[in-house]
Structure formats: structure tokens, C-alpha cells
């Protein structure tokens, strides 16, 4: 049996989402901005430009700002005129390159955005160099013709610069984008690798904890089996000195089978475990594909949580107590002494019997073959024997042997002396919230186990629940149990506990057991079922109507659980969803239940029945007595139903 700790009614699954905020190194650059050359320093957002006036103004401003030209003497001769023009022309060209470099929008883009990478300095040679003006000396008589020649290349410069600007501006931006993308990818890969390493380390730690839990649970399970005196377990070899004593069982459930076992006095501390620090120090192997999507990581984390919760409780072993049928049924029946009838049904009775050899007590279910055939219960009876002989669970009654004679079928069960839950519920009128929760939790574990075996119980009610001497539940009467892969259409069960899909003959499956659990919890807390009437068809109508009236003082969490279990739509019913019984176990009404401890029966139940001795039957109601074994028929008698129960 495995435990799983999700939260579905809580419905919560933890997931890890990787958030990698992108660092935008272009945050200072406007998305769509047109830069043009203006008369000031740097680009402006204006659309038009006057080249002639700006050029003349720049030349005039440069000349006026020059310290050498502030007090320059007037031209007195042609030679002085040429010398002055040559000096002014060189000065203008030098200032032109400097001003145009500073006015370039590309200069401001790089200067403003590349500062984040450190102390970046724009090289002095980085400029949009215009074509050099014509420096040929001309006669003094043509000064007015030279001035238009100087203005003409200056008019062509903005056009050439505007053509070169987009190409040169795009190249550094593309390089920066590529560098940033590479850095972001590297950061993402590093983060993903770190998360994968952490997940693998957590998985290793969880596996170590699970292994330790499984070892402890196996030891405790073996100790429990030793105490019950059921299996023959050899003494285990240990590092410390142990003493082994062989004893004969006196357990009332198994001593009639004449089994012996060896008790080994070992403790959990004697078992050697590998140190956790050594296991955690082992190198971890990274995944071959470390880059995964957040959706994939969420799915993996959900699957891991489900597996961890399901692996907390080990699966129960196969029923190793079941014995093959005896060679001679009549001789086998002579070994038992009939005490009294403790239960009755439509086609049979249940007897308390005692083994005459060792004095142990059992419950014998006797069924008349003719009645079984007349009521068309052959398939159900064969299914009950087949299922109980192949399963074992702490909260399901154990079947030890099945055999038949010429007229009857016999099922040998363990005797549960605490009586039926139905009897105790009628005496106390109703159970407390804690008592009902304890019984319901053990039933949830039993149903979870059965459903994993594809077994539908279909007859959950207080009459089929027994209480043992430690106060724990034992589910009995598997007459309606059936292995179902998908759906079945047989109409069977108790009217007050039938699910709507059974009444409507739509086909039913495992979801009907969760509906019956909701009815049972309501009845344990209220003292009566939610859908009750003297007329069977009136009960069916109330079930289909789905109106539930809760009494005053009903627990709020229990009310919410019952409403979720008693959902008419089986596709939305709690327990029948994707996570199955895990949704029921994660409901807040069961928040204080330790499922692993409950499965291992570490604590006694809330109610310990009064049992004077092993064969005490005072907790069962009185029934009319009837002989368990009939007289053998004549030697010429031929069993007409032998072919129907050949595998019994």
C-alpha cells in the first residue's frame, strides 16, 4: 500500500517557474527618433535643416570664438589677404571636424549607452569626416568666387552623412543586442543547471529517506506478524548478538492452522544503514538536456510529488495466510466445534467456531449451494473467494481457507470479537467527530488499496464493518466486490447507500465506493443516513434529487467533505478524480491524520470493545441457532452444482 500526500481538495501543487528579467541596455534610446544636424551641439528632434545659414553661422561663431582672431588687423594687401584666408581656412577645417564629431547622433548614442560597460572613451579618430575643401590658392581678385566653392561641399556633407548614419548606427546596436542575448542565454543556462542540481539533490535525499522508512516499516510489519503468530520468519543475521526463541502460536486467528514461527529479538538500531552524508556527497549527473520549459518543469514536479506521497506507505503483501482446500471437507469440519450464530444473510449464516485441537476461534461462513444458485449469486460468491484469497490489508478481514461439501460452501475467516460498527452506532446513537474521522480514515486506506487492485467493493455500510480488540476497523462481506477495469452494470448494494449511476443503470465503477463513504460519514455523525424512507423507491427518488439536510452542530469540514463525496456527477466526485484517494486524504477534515502511523496500527482506536476472552461473542446480536453441518447424503448422491463451484 502506498501513501500519497497531495493537496487536491486543497488542490495545491507546488511548481517552480524561472523568471529571467531581460536587461535592456537600450533603455535610454528612444524607439523611433529621427536625428538631424542642428546649429547647436548634438542632434535635435527637428525635421528640417538649413545648411547654408548653419554653416555660415558656425564659421562666424568659430572665428569669433577664436582668441587669435578677436583683435585681427584689417587686410592691407593682397599677400596679407591670402595669408589670412589660408589661416582661417585651416582653422575652420579643424573646428569643423571636432564640431561635426560632437554633433553626430551616433557619438551621443555610444557615449550615453556604452558607459554601462565601464569608462568608455570615444576615439578621437571616430568621426564622420567630410570631404576636404578645395585649398588651391586663387588670386585676390576672386574672393567672392571662392566662397561659393567652400559652401558647396558643406551643403553636400549633411546628405552624405545622413546616408552613412543608419548603416553605422545599426552595426554597434546589432553587436550589443547579440552580446546581450548571449549573456542572457548563459544566465538562463546557469540558473537552470543550478535548479536541476538542487532537484537532483532533493530527489536523492528523498530516496534515502524513503529507503529508511521502508526498512523501518518492514521491520515493524514483521514484528506485527510475529505478534499475531501468523508467518514463519527466520531470524535475521545482525551485527550484535541476538537471542532466538521458537514458540508455538496461541493467536485465536491462526493457531488452528498449527503454524510455528521464530521470534528474533532485534531492534531497529541494529540494522546498518549507509551514512547520509556519504550518499549526499556523491557527484550528481546533470541531465543531458538541461534547458526545459517551465511547463515541463511543473509537470515533472507534480509527478514527483505524487510519487513521493504514494510511496510513503508500502504496498501490502499478498495473502500468504490462505491455505489450499482440504482433501476431505468432512474430516476438516470435524476439527471445529460450533459455538453460536453471529451473523445471518439471505442464503447463509456466519458461525463462531472453535478448533478442538488448539482451542482457537474462527468465524465460519456457510452458504447453501441451492440458495446461491436460485438467487443467481454464483458469480458474486466465486468473486468473493477469489478476491479475499489474493489480498491482505490491515483493515480487511483475513480469509484463511475455502472448501465445500456436497451441499454447502465454507469460508474460514479470522474472528473479530469487537462486533459490528452498526451495533455500537445504534447503542451510542451517533459517533463523535474524532471517532467517525478515525474509522473513515481507515476505510479510505482500505478503499485506496482495493481500487489500486481494480476492485470495487460496492457494499460499504455499518453492518459490514467490524471492530477488533484494538479498536481498528475490519471490512468484511465481499459478496458484491468485483474486479472492474472500466464500468459494470449490475444492480447490487444497499438502497440507502446506492450511488445515482447505479440507480440509473448508466454503468458504474470505483466512484460508487466514494459515494457510499459520504453516506457512511453522514450516518456516523448524525445517527441516520441522509436518504431514508420506508419505501425503497422513495429512497431512490431522494438520492436522485440530491437534497441533503444537515443537523445542527454538524462539523463544517465534515459537511464540506460529505458534499464533495455526494456529488451526483461521478466525473466531479471527490475520490474519482485524477488523483483518486489522494484528494480525499488531503481534505482538511483529515488534516490531523498521520496516514503512515494509522496504516501501521501504532495507536489504538477511539473505542476499545469489552472482550472477556478470545471467544467472547457478547458484542454480537443474538440469532436463531441452526446446525452448521448437515448430515452427509447417501453414497449415490451426485452434486448438481459441482461444475458451478469447481474453482471454489
Curated annotation (Swiss-Prot):
For region Disordered, the annotated ranges are 1-25, 40-86, 121-175, 219-290
Query: Does the record bear ATP-binding in its keywords?
Result: yes
* Gene3D superfamilies in alphabetical order: Phosphorylase Kinase, domain 1 (3.30.200.20), Transferase(Phosphotransferase) domain 1 (1.10.510.10)
Sequence ranges assigned to domain AGC-kinase C-terminal in this UniProt record: 591-648
Skewed-composition ranges (Polar residues): 255-290
A single Gene Ontology MF term assigned here is: cAMP-dependent protein kinase activity
Positions bearing Phosphothreonine: 490
Q: Which Pfam families match?
A: Pkinase
Q: Give the record's GO CC terms.
A: cAMP-dependent protein kinase complex; centrosome; cytosol
Q: Where is the composition biased (Low complexity)?
A: 1-20, 46-67, 136-175, 232-254
| Keyword Nucleotide-binding attached | yes
Q: Which UniProt keywords apply?
A: ATP-binding, cAMP, Kinase, Nucleotide-binding, Phosphoprotein, Serine/threonine-protein kinase, Transferase
Show the catalytic activity. L-seryl-[protein] + ATP = O-phospho-L-seryl-[protein] + ADP + H(+); L-threonyl-[protein] + ATP = O-phospho-L-threonyl-[protein] + ADP + H(+)
Name the SUPFAM superfamilies for this protein.
Protein kinase-like (PK-like) (SSF56112)
Q: Which InterPro entries does the record cross-reference, listed alphabetically? A: AGC-kinase_C, Kinase-like_dom_sf, Prot_kinase_dom, Protein_kinase_ATP_BS, Ser/Thr_kinase_AS
Tell me which SMART domains the record gives: S_TK_X, S_TKc
Q: How does it assemble?
A: In Dictyostelium the holoenzyme is a dimer composed of a regulatory (R) and a catalytic (C) subunit. In the presence of cAMP it dissociates into the active C subunit and an R monomer.
Which family would the database say this protein is a member of? Belongs to the protein kinase superfamily. AGC Ser/Thr protein kinase family. cAMP subfamily.
Q: What is this protein called?
A: cAMP-dependent protein kinase catalytic subunit
Q: Which organism is it from?
A: Dictyostelium discoideum
Task: Report which gene this protein is encoded by.
Answer: pkaC
Amino acid at each position: 500500500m502506498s501513501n500519497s500526500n497531495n493537496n487536491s481538495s486543497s488542490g495545491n501543487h507546488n511548481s517552480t517557474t524561472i523568471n529571467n528579467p531581460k536587461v535592456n541596455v537600450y533603455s535610454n534610446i528612444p524607439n523611433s527618433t529621427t536625428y538631424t544636424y542642428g546649429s547647436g551641439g548634438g542632434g535635435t528632434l527637428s525635421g528640417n535643416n538649413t545648411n547654408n545659414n548653419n554653416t555660415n553661422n558656425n564659421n562666424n561663431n568659430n572665428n569669433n570664438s577664436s582668441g587669435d582672431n578677436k583683435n585681427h588687423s584689417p587686410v592691407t594687401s593682397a599677400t596679407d589677404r591670402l595669408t589670412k584666408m589660408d589661416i582661417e581656412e585651416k582653422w575652420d577645417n579643424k573646428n569643423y571636424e571636432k564640431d561635426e564629431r560632437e554633433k553626430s547622433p551616433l557619438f551621443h548614442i555610444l557615449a550615453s549607452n556604452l558607459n554601462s560597460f565601464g569608462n568608455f572613451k570615444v576615439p578621437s579618430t571616430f568621426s564622420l569626416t567630410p570631404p576636404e575643401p578645395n585649398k588651391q590658392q586663387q588670386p585676390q581678385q576672386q574672393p567672392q568666387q571662392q566662397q561659393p566653392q567652400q559652401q558647396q561641399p558643406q551643403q553636400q556633407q549633411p546628405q552624405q552623412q545622413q546616408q552613412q548614419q543608419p548603416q553605422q548606427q545599426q552595426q554597434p546596436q546589432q553587436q550589443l543586442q547579440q552580446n546581450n542575448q548571449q549573456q542572457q542565454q548563459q544566465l538562463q543556462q546557469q540558473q537552470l543547471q543550478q535548479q536541476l542540481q538542487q532537484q537532483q539533490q532533493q530527489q536523492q535525499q528523498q530516496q534515502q529517506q524513503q529507503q529508511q522508512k521502508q526498512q523501518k516499516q518492514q521491520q515493524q510489519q514483521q514484528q506485527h506478524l510475529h505478534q499475531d503468530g501468523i508467518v514463519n520468519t527466520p531470524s535475521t543475521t545482525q551485527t550484535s548478538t541476538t537471542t532466538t526463541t521458537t514458540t508455538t502460536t496461541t493467536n485465536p486467528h491462526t493457531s488452528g492452522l498449527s503454524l510455528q514461527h521464530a521470534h528474533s529479538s532485534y531492534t531497529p538500531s541494529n540494522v546498518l544503514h549507509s551514512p547520509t552524508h556519504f550518499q549526499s556527497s556523491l557527484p550528481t549527473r546533470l541531465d543531458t538536456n538541461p534547458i526545459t520549459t517551465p511547463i515541463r518543469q511543473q509537470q515533472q514536479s507534480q509527478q514527483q510529488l505524487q510519487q513521493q506521497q504514494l510511496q510513503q506507505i508500502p504496498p501490502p503483501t499478498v495473502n500468504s495466510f490462505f491455505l489450499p482446500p482440504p482433501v476431505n471437507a468432512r474430516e476438516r469440519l470435524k476439527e471445529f466445534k460450533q459455538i453460536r450464530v453471529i451473523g445471518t444473510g439471505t442464503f447463509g449464516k456466519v458461525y463462531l467456531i472453535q478448533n478442538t485441537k488448539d482451542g482457537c476461534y474462527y468465524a465460519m461462513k456457510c452458504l447453501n449451494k441451492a440458495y446461491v444458485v436460485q438467487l443467481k449469486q454464483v458469480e458474486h460468491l466465486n468473486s468473493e473467494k477469489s478476491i479475499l484469497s489474493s489480498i491482505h490489508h490491515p483493515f480487511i478481514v483475513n480469509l484463511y481457507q475455502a472448501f465445500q461439501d456436497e451441499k454447502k460452501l465454507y469460508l474460514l475467516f479470522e474472528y473479530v470479537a469487537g462486533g459490528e460498527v452498526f451495533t455500537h452506532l445504534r447503542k451510542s446513537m451517533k459517533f463523535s467527530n474524532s471517532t467517525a474521522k478515525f474509522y473513515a480514515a481507515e476505510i479510505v486506506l482500505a478503499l485506496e488499496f482495493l481500487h489500486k487492485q481494480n476492485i470495487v467493493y460496492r457494499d460499504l455500510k455499518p453492518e459490514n464493518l467490524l471492530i477488533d480488540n484494538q479498536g481498528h476497523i475490519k471490512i468484511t462481506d465481499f459478496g458484491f466486490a468485483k474486479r472492474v477495469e472500466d464500468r459494470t452494470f449490475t444492480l447490487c448494494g444497499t438502497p440507502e447507500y446506492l450511488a445515482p449511476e447505479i440507480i440509473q443503470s448508466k454503468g458504474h465503477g470505483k466512484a460508487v465506493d466514494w459515494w457510499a463513504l459520504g453516506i457512511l460519514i453522514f450516518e456516523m455523525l448524525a445517527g441516520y443516513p441522509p436518504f431514508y424512507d420506508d419505501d425503497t423507491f422513495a429512497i431512490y427518488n431522494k438520492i436522485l434529487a440530491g437534497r441533503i439536510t444537515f443537523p445542527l452542530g454538524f462539523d463544517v469540514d465534515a459537511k464540506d467533505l460529505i458534499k464533495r463525496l455526494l456529488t451526483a456527477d461521478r466525473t466531479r466526485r471527490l475520490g474519482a478524480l485524477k488523483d483518486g484517494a489522494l484528494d480525499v486524504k488531503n481534505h482538511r477534515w483529515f488534516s490531523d491524520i498521520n496516514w503512515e502511523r494509522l496504516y501501521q496500527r501504532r495507536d489504538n482506536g477511539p473505542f476499545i470493545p469489552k472482550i472477556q476472552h478470545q471467544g467472547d461473542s457478547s458484542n454480537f446480536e443474538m440469532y436463531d441457532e441452526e446446525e452448521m453441518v448437515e448430515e452427509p447424503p447417501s453414497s449415490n448422491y451426485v452434486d448438481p452444482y459441482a461444475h458451478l463451484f469447481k474453482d471454489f
